[in-house]
């Protein structure tokens, strides 16, 4: 049990130095803060998927995956002739 506590304090030290030690915890200034951020981000994505439905959520991901620093996903989709059905982005009623 002591090794678990030691590992936690090591991770907390790294987090306080600015290192991301929890996937999805970017920006947290401590181990606990990073864990809370990661949990909130995960929950936010799940809620959005429930609101839009799996199909709309996937379609939005397709569009976002096409974006770059130079152009938005919508601009690239139009330029390359990729069909993105934005009607699927609407939340379910």
Curated annotation (Swiss-Prot):
One of its GO terms (biological process) is response to abscisic acid. The keyword Heme does not apply. Residues 1-93 are annotated as: Disordered. Embryos and young seedlings. InterPro entries: LEA_5, Sm_Hydphi_plant_seed_CS, Small_hydrophilic_seed_prot. One of its GO terms (cellular component) is cytosol. It comes from the Eukaryota. Residues 9-19, 73-93 have a biased composition (Basic and acidic residues). The keyword Ribonucleoprotein does not apply. Induction: By abscisic acid (ABA), osmotic stress and salt. Keywords: Stress response. Belongs to the small hydrophilic plant seed protein family. Lea proteins are late embryonic proteins abundant in higher plant seed embryos. It may have a role in desiccation tolerance by acting as an osmoprotective protein or as a desiccation-damage repair protein. This is Late embryogenesis abundant protein B19.1A.
